């Protein structure tokens, strides 16, 4: 609700931060179903990444604020970190209602998947004190992540590609272009994003697919030109597929915990409403 009010009803940044703070644990990490497909109250890298996305959505960059300081403290503590990557999957998820894809028998990076590590490294570079130990660790992780990306060592899905995109954006915002080869990263991401977007638009309404809004929400994006047809189509698609209750269809399902999934599904619907309207707004359609 605070996010909606911020974007569309002149709501305050403070209201969003206050709501977000209830999901933050004493260790600085986030839990409590902020990412609504896992009800694990304990801190995890994925839930903490979700918090960074909300901060980015409201353009909040004050690194003296307790929320950002807490996140940096959590990352510095190296909880759920194997020395190279933060765990994408944490075993404590199993103790609470969750989607099948968050179930795991061991804490795992999912075979060195840089989701959410690339984004978290970028967050460190953007908000830690420059040349601090934490900043330098973020730089090291970023270089390792980019090496994997450019070496094409693994197939990266849309969520991992988005984490690399965030890494690039954070580095640009930190004016730290010397850390990685930004031009090479941008070129690689351009190709990956185009290939990742589901061009068969008949699948969009009923399948869990990748749409342009996964990566950008306005024509000013450097990735718009190569994906203009699909991006413009998405505006029409959003307008055409709104349900009678004002929301949009959720194209995935937990296949377990039906009572909790019914609640999480509504949380996802609320999130989808905000993101869809922001996309239309970015394209001048509101």
Model-identified regions with their sequence ranges:
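Preference for long, amphipathic alpha-helical scaffolds in soluble/luminal domains
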Residues: 1-286
């Amino acid at each position: 609700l605070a996010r909606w009010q911020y974007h569309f009803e002149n709501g305050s940044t403070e209201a969003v931060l206050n709501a977000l703070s209830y999901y933050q644990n004493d260790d600085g990490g986030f839990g409590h179903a902020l990412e609504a497909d896992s009800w694990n109250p304990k801190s995890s890298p994925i839930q903490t990444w979700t918090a960074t996305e909300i901060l980015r959505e409201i353009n909040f960059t004050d690194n003296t604020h307790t929320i950002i300081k807490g996140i940096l403290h959590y990352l510095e503590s190296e909880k759920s970190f194997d020395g190279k990557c933060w765990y994408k999957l944490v075993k404590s998820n199993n103790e609470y209602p969750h989607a099948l894809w968050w179930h795991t028998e061991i804490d795992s990076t999912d075979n060195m998947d840089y989701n959410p590590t690339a984004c978290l490294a970028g967050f460190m570079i953007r908000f830690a004190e420059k040349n601090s130990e934490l900043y330098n660790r973020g730089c090291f992780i970023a270089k390792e992540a980019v090496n994997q990306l450019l070496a094409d060592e693994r197939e990266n899905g849309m969520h991992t590609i988005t984490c690399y995109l965030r890494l690039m954006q954070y580095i640009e915002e930190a004016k730290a272009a010397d850390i990685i080869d930004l031009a090479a990263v941008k070129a690689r991401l351009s190709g990956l994003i185009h290939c990742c977007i589901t061009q068969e638009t008949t699948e969009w309404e009923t399948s869990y697919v990748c749409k342009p809004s996964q990566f950008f929400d306005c024509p000013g994006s450097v990735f718009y030109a190569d994906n203009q047809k699909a991006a413009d189509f998405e505006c029409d698609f959003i307008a055409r597929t709104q349900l009678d209750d004002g929301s949009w269809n959720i194209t995935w399902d937990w296949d377990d915990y039906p009572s909790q999934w019914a609640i999480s599904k509504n949380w996802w619907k609320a999130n989808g409403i905000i993101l869809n309207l922001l996309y239309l707004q970015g394209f001048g359609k509101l």
